[in-house]
């Protein structure tokens, strides 16, 4: 059996840059899957991607399928022949379906009996007869949200296809994909090198494309070169480039022959908040901003061209010419916005709906300011500042800058608040109200900002749940899952003394009679506890540990966190397994008993030494641990409770709980109930596996 390199390249018009990598990775994944299904052995699978091509190269692909041993089981021997030894209808029908006579069948003996069996070897087909179809199947599974059609063909793809190349070694694999016949033609760079050329062997790829076509097909090589060249360009002007990976990946997906240039803009534009300038550079123009060593934006930017220009100064001038009017617009918007304070813009919020049934943004900020003040009073933040920040939190949505650059909401509010002499804590809270915006994002930095961020998110959660617009499946138009997790992260990571029950109740009260969901508070709590479960699972906590804590239905997020940390630590202790098993036994005894345990232990009814010893330990710990539970020292409490392992083990070995004597039985149930109650002050450890 021989092996050859297999190459498939699909030449297209410019592919969407933000999805280029996911397209080619999926192509490689599904093609590998199809090769494996076809029993074609192969080596390493490598993918290549540029704006005008998707390619996959498979090393050491077997040129012939493996032979496959096929087995077809028939009826059991007992049903295959009658008492006289003659074949039954079931046996003859099975043999006919296999194309054999019954005497050609073998038998298969298993622990369940003996069966008729026919096995044969299916010879492998040549890879060249299979590959075109396997490529088609792989391409049909790519994650494409919107397909295009072109020309007279019925074929549809993310972009029009111009060339298809399928090579197994030096053999051209015939096939028609997207209406295009497979051929050896490879397209080069649009403006450099050879426009097209012939490839003779799969091993020539991608080097031949680099040499003849002036196309760097290796995505990671291109990405690394761009990053290195940008860093060098920034260093030449004493700057540090802002190279976010998302932008770097997008630019890598936009060019086939990257050439880095440095351009500049007028210093006067630096008077505009840097966030607006950076937004224009990165989001609109795909430029890389640069900063000085102090972190201040400099009047330069770095861009990546897709050509080795004959006139670099003209190319740089052209890009500077493009950015200048955009910056001039931003400067005009900014200066115009400064003429009106955030407070003066409040009435205009009455013209914007928050949600049809929940009223306008003006009504929302009235609620947010009140809830911010209430939260501030609970967590020790400045109440006056929190109320003011809540009131002004949405005013920047009515400014020219935010209308033009929506991503700067909050940021521009901070700048405008500072310009109009609002306290810095108020200004910062306006900016940080949206944090955390995504997983791993920063949290609000001050207690005032925490108050506003929690208030804004809780107002949205309460309102949308209140009109029964709950998230369903992957549909969450109001971002309620993100809002819930944001609230939980702030409370837990800032260790804030907030209770979800009272927080939600206050948010509900501020809505007046707008809400119609009668089960609102419980629904929101359950929803947020569900977010807890997902968050802590992703953080590596066992689902049984999470369930053990959730069984207590804690409504204080910081308290939940303390409990889960304590349980996670407890599981590492030698005594944990035995105590968990004993707790399950205690739980089963109590749940199955028809008797109702007494609230206290009658020491006069304790007869056996083992129950006397256990009761003494429980009563001592009950008294000792009371302040631990009040202070939330759950880990320390569990460290003390492990002392119950030995007396509990001895108790179960020497004492019968469900005795006929009712007084003794009820007293022993009370003893176990006391023990279980101690552990339940932390979590229900009977859930632990």
Curated annotation (Swiss-Prot):
It is an enzyme of class 6 (ligase). GO terms for cellular component: cytosol. InterPro entries: DALR_anticod-bd, Gly-tRNA-synth_bsu, Gly-tRNA-synth_heterodimer. Pfam families: DALR_1 (PF05746), tRNA_synt_2f (PF02092). One of its GO terms (biological process) is arginyl-tRNA aminoacylation. Keywords: Aminoacyl-tRNA synthetase, ATP-binding, Cytoplasm, Ligase, Nucleotide-binding, Protein biosynthesis. GO terms for molecular function: arginine-tRNA ligase activity; ATP binding; glycine-tRNA ligase activity. Its EC number is 6.1.1.14. Its main location: cytoplasm. SUPFAM superfamilies: HD-domain/PDEase-like (SSF109604). It catalyses: tRNA(Gly) + glycine + ATP = glycyl-tRNA(Gly) + AMP + diphosphate. It is found in: Cytoplasm. Belongs to the class-II aminoacyl-tRNA synthetase family. Tetramer of two alpha and two beta subunits. This is Glycine--tRNA ligase beta subunit.
């Amino acid at each position: 059996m021989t092996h050859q390199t297999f190459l498939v390249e699909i030449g297209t018009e410019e592919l969407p840059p933000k999805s280029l990598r996911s397209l080619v990775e999926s192509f490689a994944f599904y093609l590998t899957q199809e090769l494996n299904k076809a029993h074609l052995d192969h080596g390493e699978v490598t993918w290549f991607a540029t704006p005008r091509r998707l390619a996959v190269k498979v090393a050491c692909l077997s040129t012939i399928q493996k032979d496959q041993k096929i087995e077809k089981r028939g009826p059991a021997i007992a049903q295959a022949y009658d008492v006289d030894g003659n074949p039954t209808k079931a046996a003859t029908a099975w043999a006919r379906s296999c194309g054999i006579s019954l005497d050609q069948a073998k038998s298969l003996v298993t622990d369940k009996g003996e069966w008729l069996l026919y096995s044969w070897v299916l010879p492998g087909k040549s890879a060249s007869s299979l590959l075109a179809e396997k490529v088609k199947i792989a391409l049909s599974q790519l994650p494409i949200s919107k397909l295009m059609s072109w020309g007279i063909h019925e074929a549809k793809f993310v972009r029009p296809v111009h060339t298809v190349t399928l090579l197994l070694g030096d053999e051209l694999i015939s096939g028609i994909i997207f209406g295009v016949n497979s051929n050896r033609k490879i397209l080069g760079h649009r403006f450099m090198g050879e426009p097209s050329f012939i490839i003779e062997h799969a091993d020539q790829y991608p080097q031949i494309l680099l040499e003849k076509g002036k196309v760097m097909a290796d995505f990671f090589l291109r990405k690394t070169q761009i990053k290195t060249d940008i860093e060098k360009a920034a260093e030449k002007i004493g700057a540090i480039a802002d190279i976010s990976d998302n932008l770097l990946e997008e630019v890598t997906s936009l060019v086939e022959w990257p050439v880095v240039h440095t351009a500049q803009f007028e210093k006067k534009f630096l008077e505009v908040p840097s966030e607006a300038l950076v937004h224009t550079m990165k989001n609109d123009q795909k430029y890389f901003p640069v900063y000085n060593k102090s972190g201040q934006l400099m009047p330069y930017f770095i861009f990546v061209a897709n050509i080795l220009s004959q006139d670099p100064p003209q190319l740089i001038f052209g890009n500077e010419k493009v950015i200048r009017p955009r910056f001039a617009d931003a400067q005009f918007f900014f200066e115009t916005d400064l003429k009106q304070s955030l407070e003066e813009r409040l009435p205009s919020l009455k013209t914007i709906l928050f949600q049809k049934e929940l009223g306008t943004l003006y009504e929302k900020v009235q609620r947010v300011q009140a809830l911010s003040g209430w939260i501030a009073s609970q967590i020790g933040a400045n109440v006056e500042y929190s109320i003011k920040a809540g009131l002004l939190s949405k005013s920047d949505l009515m400014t020219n800058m935010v209308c033009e650059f929506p991503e700067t909401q909050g940021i521009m509010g901070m700048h405008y608040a500072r310009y109009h002499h609002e306290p810095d804590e108020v200004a910062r809270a306006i900016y940080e109200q949206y944090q955390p915006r995504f997983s791993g994002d920063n949290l609000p930095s001050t207690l005032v900002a925490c108050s506003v961020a929690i208030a804004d998110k809780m107002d949205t959660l309460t309102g949308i749940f209140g009109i029964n617009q709950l998230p369903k499946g992957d549909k969450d138009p109001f971002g309620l899952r993100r809002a819930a997790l944001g609230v939980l992260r702030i409370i837990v990571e800032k260790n804030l003394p907030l209770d979800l029950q009272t927080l939600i109740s206050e948010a509900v009260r501020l809505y007046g009679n707008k809400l119609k969901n009668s089960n609102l508070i419980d629904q929101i709590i359950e929803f947020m506890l569900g977010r807890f479960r997902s968050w802590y699972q992703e953080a590596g906590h066992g689902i049984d540990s999470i369930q053990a804590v959730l069984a207590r239905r804690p409504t204080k997020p910081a308290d939940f966190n303390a409990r889960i940390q304590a349980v996670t630590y407890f599981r590492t202790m030698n005594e944990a397994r035995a105590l968990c098993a004993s707790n399950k036994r205690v739980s089963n005894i109590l749940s199955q008993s028809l008797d109702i345990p007494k609230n206290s232990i009658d020491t006069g009814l304790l007869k056996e030494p083992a129950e006397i010893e256990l009761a003494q330990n429980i009563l001592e710990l009950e008294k000792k641990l009371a302040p631990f539970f009040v202070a939330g020292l759950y880990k320390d409490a569990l460290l003390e409770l492990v002392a119950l392992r030995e007396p509990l083990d001895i108790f179960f070995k020497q004492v019968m709980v469900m005795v006929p004597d009712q007084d003794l039985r009820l007293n022993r149930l009370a003893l176990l109930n006391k023990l279980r109650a101690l552990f339940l002050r932390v979590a229900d450890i009977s859930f632990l596996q």
